[in-house]
Amino acid sequence: MSLIKRIVMRLNVECVWTRLGFYTCFVYNKRKPLLEFEPPILGGHVGDFCDLAVVSFNNSEVVEYQIRTLRKFFKYPFRYTVFDNSTNEERSAEILAICKKHSVGYVKLPKQEFLPKGYGSYSHGIACNYLFNKYIKNGGAKYFMLLDHDIFLIDDFDISKQFDSQFFYGAKHGFYIWPGLWAMKMNVILKHGVDFRPSFHLHGDTGACNYYHFFKGMEWSKFHLVKDVHCFLDDSDDDIFRNGYSLMDDCWLHCWNASDYMGKGVDNKMNRIFAMLEEKLKLCM
């Protein structure tokens, strides 16, 4: 490829990202949510609780298992809210019904019709920013934890014990903390700001822009990082999106690709993982 073609391609991509930034700032961020059910109450004094937030996407079953496992194993007062970024209205209705069933908050996020196809990471990132700035920032929580919709707690966990010697909790992805298991004290976030968008210039996925807020120049070896151990349901298939999951910090199970956005075919995998979760829940009844 000639130098001129590379320059033109680079400029085209730069223009796309600039346009996305403009629309996000002046259009998306100013939109009202499409629907709210018992959303987080804003204002008031800081309380001893953790705001747990999840961006759901086209899968209601994982949301219900996440609620059940958190209520069983999360050993600190928390408020849990589902921020629905689903593109399938039927799935959104199912997720809302589950939230009503379990009496947890639900917010249907604004549409993102301005995003080109293939910008799922950007979609997730601006959804995370929207939920934090609109609902969490002034919600009065002592801690904030952001979860992927297909991650489940499978053993006792106390968020208040994670910050004795450091300011964050989570797994390192590249040069930042993965936003699927991401937690900090609220006063730290409010001091430095937060940005969960991916970064074109850093070649980073969702959450990469937080590098500039928290992690630039950090000596990672001085901090405890959540271990991410890959496990497979069948030895004959090493595709983690179709046949595997991660065990994180010995107490979190991350499914990978639960909504099958990669088109791998995950029905068998998810049924087996749900069976594993049922066993965990029964053992502690």
What are the language-model segments listed below?
Residues 70, 131, 159-163:
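A short, amphipathic alpha-helix embedded in the catalytic core of nucleotide-handling enzymes
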Residues 140-152:
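Short beta-strand-to-loop acidic/aromatic patch adjacent to the donor-nucleotide binding site
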Residues 6-11, 15-27, 205-285:
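C-terminal catalytic/acceptor-binding lobe
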